[in-house]
């Protein structure tokens, strides 16, 4: 009986600790995909429109047209 009570109290304490730490970290961590794009944009420079793009070259500022293998700017709205 005592062991059961000790186990129940331990589980409740561990659950409470997890809830407290999860609440404290809210807003600190960014979404995984946003972090990776900001790291890439800070660490590499992009290729201008008209430059050759392929699997071994740097990233285009816009996007890479795979059929023509040239960097193209995003269309403006």
Swiss-Prot record:
Expressed by the venom duct. The presence of a 'disulfide through disulfide knot' structurally defines this protein as a knottin. Pfam families: Conotoxin. Belongs to the conotoxin O1 superfamily. GO terms for cellular component: extracellular region; host cell presynaptic membrane. Omega-conotoxins act at presynaptic membranes, they bind and block voltage-gated calcium channels (Cav). Disulfide bonds join 46-61, 53-64, 60-71. This is Omega-conotoxin-like 6. PROSITE patterns: OMEGA_CONOTOXIN (PS60004). It comes from Conus striatus. Residues 1-22 form the signal peptide. Transmembrane segments: none annotated.
């Amino acid at each position: 009986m005592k062991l059961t009570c000790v186990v129940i109290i331990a589980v409740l304490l561990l659950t409470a600790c997890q809830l407290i730490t999860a609440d404290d970290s809210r807003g600190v961590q960014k979404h995984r995909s946003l972090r990776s794009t900001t790291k890439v944009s800070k660490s590499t420079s992009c290729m201008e429109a008209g430059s050759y793009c392929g699997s071994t070259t740097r990233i285009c500022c816009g996007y890479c047209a795979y059929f023509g293998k040239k960097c193209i700017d995003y269309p403006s709205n």
